[in-house]
Amino acid sequence: MITVHFVHGARSYLPELAAYQAHIERLGHAVQMHTQAHTVPDDAQAVWWICGRVPAAQARRLQGAVQVHEYTSASVAPLAWLKDRIKQWQHPVPDFRVFQSEWVRQRMGFEGDAVPYALRDMGVPESFLTAQALQPPEFDLVYLGEMRRLLHFVPLLQTLGQAGLKLLLVGDVPPDLKAHLAALGHIQSTGRLPHDQVPAQLLRARAGLNLMPDVLPLSEQTSTKLLEYLALGLPVVSNPYAWAKRTAQAHAGRVQLLGLQASAAHWQAAMQALPLRQTDRQHLASLGWSHQLQALPVWDALFGAGR
């Protein structure tokens, strides 16, 4: 049995870590999580860095281990390009790399070397694919995810109220956003919830709301919440940006794109045109974490071809 030591930032929300742990344990191996590299034992056999910065001294200390570098996203502004180049130049060379997408791989600039790699998109827990609503929806829309991001969309939130639409926020609302929401009686929030309670909260609404600033790298990266809405059978309303447009094409009729300047009347019409919630989602099995992880070649690198 091999223990895989994951090193990640304590402040990051990384649902993939739970999926990795479950998959690795199903393969008969073990997992330990670390927020500081120095807590990884010297005799570790496998170290999986969620990048972030990989300290060269720690990588040398652990040179007896198979080392994986995972890039879940490219760097964000300010100085995003420079941050990515610093990672490219300063990171030690690993045994394997994992990228969320081909776009992230190219953005990080590693395409010229010989290190083997895999692309691993975001997934959803299998429980999302089977959860069912137990009562009619109480809200028109539900939003899950990074709440601070909603500060970019306060005018849109006001438009939802003008359209007579009720919005549920699933998660912890920061104080600066609360100040904006105080005058908006059409919005309620749940506060922070354990992830296993999220499906029931999302199913309280008719549709999922996906809002993302149309700036790199956010506009090219997977919106996990949009995948979770789809996995629960909810139709989705999203602002248009590159990744959302591709996803709307891949899930024809399930994702409606609506511009940020859309009027209250446009929102009312969009909501009336939404399809019904899907109760049978077997065709969406590929969104599940088990499907995303099972074929990754990184397992052979860590555990050998026999696993």
Feature roles, as predicted:
Residues 47-48, 60-77:
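Active-site proximal beta-strand in glycosyltransferases
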Residues 95-130:
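Donor nucleotide-sugar binding/catalytic pocket of nucleotide-sugar-dependent glycosyltransferases
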